[in-house]
Amino acid sequence: MCTTLFLFSLAMLWRRRFTNRVEPEPSRVDGTVVGSGSDTDLQSTGREKGPVK
């Protein structure tokens, strides 16, 4: 029984972690609509810096 409770608690923790990771993605989509230019600039800048180094 202790093992079952332990596994159940681990499953709940993993679900919470995955849920937290999934939630920001839709928020980024909403943010992308508002500041898509800023997000694109940051990504392109990061890509340019990589090859230069």
Curated annotation (Swiss-Prot):
Source domain of life is: Eukaryota
Maturation and modification = Palmitoylated at Cys-2. Palmitoylation is essential for protein stability and trafficking to the photoreceptor outer segment, but does not appear to be essential for membrane localization. Probably palmitoylated by ZDHHC3.
Predominant localisation class: other
Which cell locations does it reside in?
A: Cell projection, Cilium, Photoreceptor outer segment; Membrane; Endoplasmic reticulum; Golgi apparatus
Q: Which UniProt keywords apply?
A: Cell projection, Endoplasmic reticulum, Golgi apparatus, Lipoprotein, Membrane, Palmitate, Sensory transduction, Vision
Q: Which PANTHER family match?
A: PHOTORECEPTOR DISK COMPONENT PRCD (PTHR38501:SF1)
Leader sequence range is none
- Bias class Polar residues marks the residues at 35-45
Residue ranges for the region (Disordered) are 24-53
- Job of this protein: Involved in vision.
Family as reported in the entry's similarity comment: Belongs to the PRCD family.
Pfam families, alphabetized? Rod_cone_degen
InterPro entries (alphabetical): PRCD (IPR027937)
Q: Which GO terms describe its biological process?
A: detection of light stimulus involved in visual perception
At which residues does the record annotate a lipid attachment of kind S-palmitoyl cysteine? 2
Q: In which tissues is it expressed?
A: Expressed in retina, where it localizes to both rod and cone photoreceptors (at protein level).
Q: Which GO terms describe its molecular function?
A: opsin binding
Q: What is this protein called?
A: Photoreceptor disk component PRCD
Output the Gene Ontology cellular-component terms: cytoplasm; endoplasmic reticulum; extracellular region; Golgi apparatus; photoreceptor outer segment; photoreceptor outer segment membrane
Q: How does it assemble?
A: Interacts with RHO/rhodopsin; the interaction promotes PRCD stability.
